[in-house]
């Protein structure tokens, strides 16, 4: 039996004993007793219908009289102790007679009867208080900070070697490490370290990992808390937790305080319908005060992470608070390769695994995606009973992460399977032929994920940060290649192109309304995203143009999509023979890799230009 079970058993026993003594004390000691004169007592005894059932004669001259209906009386009659006639009369009436000694023992019994319940009550109360003040109870720690403190040590210590794909951010954070290690170096020349550092970047880019790496490099305590941990139902709790957090930080300085998802508490004040959330605003106000109230020379660095810096309160971002902002971008190809090396260094890899190729095939993946990819590949290898992770495992893992797990058991009729094959082959052919099309890495007609009956995987040759009008038009044409193939080959269209049409329409509308790529409307932006209601979630789109312009926008969007669709059908008709060959191979193999696809298309294909 472990310690907690023993304490629970003792607690139960204490409760039972306490209840027993309390019942005895209140029932016996406080039972209703009435005084009765000796004359009335004699009359009750001599009455033919006597209700007396028992008489207890005590040596102190007190008679305790019990009636048949449960009432109790006391009679003061000192002479009754030696009155033999009274005793004979009681016996003759059939009344039970007994004696009772009243002395020191009775006194101590009364004392113990009072003290024992009191002592037991105190013991139980202390036990309850001890339990409530335990580490996992919130009754007495409701206003305490929920921050978790990590002390870098041993294998759990995270350093910059454990972070990949964020070299610029690491360079910016190295001076923070130097300050935490040797503050006097900066104090001598009057330099002030930023009180707050805001890490900005999409989810999964490693913002929390960077903060822990700074603490690990400087070998200082690391306080981690989420912005949502401050705000509670009761007003004032969040502000109290902020005060407690900074009190703990000052006690462990030098240290790092890291607030994850700070937008949960740091949103613009006064935003929203009906005013702001009083508790959140009080918490934010207290955070602002605390960041003003400590000196950066104390060695406390406040770091925070968010993927929505645009909704943060301006007072939080002014110099003297979060005055240093570091952008953590998604990694490029070299960054992805380094991240893969970090996540695979303790995993057995087969000789055919090429991390550079995997990095090229995962554009847009952030650190969290790549870690999940490596883990998925390891799970696949373990499922197959292999001792090492092969390149095939990584290829399948990429497909599973992008499109979902294969559903090979899903039954599809031969007719629908052929339609799906032409649809996916249409995407591949058009994307290969257009001048700015992304190279096709794989096409498959194996159903995956929730809805996908097939998919075409593109592999960009490099990471791109700008996109031209012609590139967008080529992308639109490739998106509509599947539907174009259905119409050209079967003379009919299916619902399989619904998502392609939705994406194509969205791209075309953005070209017209946001990017100024419409020949008819010119380089103007039409419409404005309305975000003033809740600051952080788009509610509607402000229409700042006339009905005539709205009609022209719709015409331009339709024109762009229609032209790209006609262009896609033209490509399908021109390369119908190659399309049919790809479909036959696809129906046989169900999956065609990019090299084989390009070999089928061969070098004589000319790029189609408008």
From Swiss-Prot:
Keywords carried by this UniProt record: ATP-binding, Cell inner membrane, Cell membrane, Hydrolase, Membrane, Metal-binding, Metalloprotease, Nucleotide-binding, Protease, Transmembrane, Transmembrane helix, Zinc
Membrane topology classification: Multi-pass membrane protein
Residues annotated for ATP binding in this entry: 164, 204-209, 343, 371
Binding site for Zn(2+): 423, 427, 500
PROSITE patterns: AAA
Active site: 424
TM ranges: 6-26, 108-128
Name of a matching Pfam family: AAA_lid_3
InterPro entries: AAA+_ATPase, AAA_lid_3, ATPase_AAA_core, ATPase_AAA_CS, FtsH, P-loop_NTPase, Pept_M41_FtsH_extracell, Peptidase_M41
Annotated cofactor note: Binds 1 zinc ion per subunit.
GO MF annotation terms: ATP binding; ATP hydrolysis activity; ATP-dependent peptidase activity; identical protein binding; metalloendopeptidase activity; zinc ion binding
Cellular-component GO terms for this entry: plasma membrane
EC number of the protein: 3.4.24.-
Annotated GO biological process: protein catabolic process; proteolysis
All ranges on the Cytoplasmic side of the membrane: 1-5, 129-610
Compartments it resides in: Cell inner membrane
Record's subunit section: The isolated ADP-bound cytosolic domain forms a 6-fold symmetric protease disk and a 2-fold symmetric AAA ATPase ring. In the absence of nucleotide the AAA ATPase ring also forms symmetric hexamers.
Entry's family note: In the central section; belongs to the AAA ATPase family.
UniProt function note: Acts as a processive, ATP-dependent zinc metallopeptidase for both cytoplasmic and membrane proteins. Plays a role in the quality control of integral membrane proteins.
Name of this protein: ATP-dependent zinc metalloprotease FtsH
Organism: Thermotoga maritima (strain ATCC 43589 / DSM 3109 / JCM 10099 / NBRC 100826 / MSB8)
